[in-house]
Amino acid sequence: MKRPLYCSTGALVGRVNGYDFRGAMKILRSLYKEERIRGLELMMLPAYYENRAAVTEAVRQSGVPSPVIHCEKEIGTMLSDAGALTDSGHEEEARALSEEAFRLFRLNCAFAEDLGIPRMVIHLWGGRTSDSHIARNVGALPELTETAAAHGIRLLVENVPSSAGDPLSNWKRVLPFLGNGGLIFDSRFGKLHEQIRETLIDPAVAPRIEHVHVSDFGGGYREFSALRPILHPGEGKIDFPALAGLLDRMGYAGSVTLESPVMGENGWDVPKLGRTLSYLGSLL
């Protein structure tokens, strides 16, 4: 089954190359023209906040469709830390941190609205606190959903690493509050928790999965230190043909984004990116 294949800007833009967004967009434009990808997923980074006009204009000028935006990851960490502060009685500090998280979230939504992006991936929890106070994170979802909707956006909650519980259990807590949103399955995080098969055959969550992130993972069960460096398919332990079979079995017709990076101090490994996209294009 041929599914829409996108490439994350996060695979091409980072501190190591001075956040060279324009250079990355040139590569993505070439890949799109060659029909190697059908679009991009805009990975939000703090460096973009002061350059909103330049970033959005670069995306527009590229002509590459932008069906998905990835909310800045730190927002989930802030929500987790705010929950921990609330439960420890530090309500004033918690309120200030939560307000800052929502301020940044609204700014992310504004980026998406500028570009007409209809779906936003969100890390609902994160950082060291992670899902230790998951009820607080889940409790924030209705307001996040309402805020996103005001900008014409639907939220997709990701199966991010969970230090207290596990992503699948947390997703099941999310479901009653998901509204018109969806779920996004990350292969690397699924392997970290050894939940790839369990998640993709689960009758409650599988039908809500409408987007997939692809990268490989070389560590063991709950080996959080092995999450980086982010590997390309074939460099780690994930059985991607088996993953593709599970997606086929569940009748998955949604989109797939490659997240594995190809950037370095001396530029981009474009041939490697091309090989990975070709592999995924033939498999998925």
Set out the residue ranges of the language-model regions.
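N-terminal pre-domain/capping segments
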Residues: 1-107, 113, 149, 180-182, ...
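Active-site beta-loop-alpha junctions enriched in small/polar residues
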Residues: 8-12, 43-45, 71-74, 125-127, ...
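Distinct, well-ordered alpha-helical segments
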Residues: 18-21, 25, 51-56, 131-142, ...
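Short acidic/polar active-site loop segments enriched in Thr and Asp
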Residues: 37-38, 65, 118, 210, ...
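Acidic/histidine-rich catalytic cores of soluble enzymes
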Residues: 39-40, 145-237
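Active-site acidic/histidine proton-transfer and metal-coordination neighborhood
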Residues: 80-182, 192
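A short, acidic, amphipathic alpha-helical segment used as a generic capping/interface helix at domain edges
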Residues: 235-249
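Aromatic-rich peripheral "rim/lid" segments of glycoside hydrolase catalytic domains that contact
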Residues: 263-284
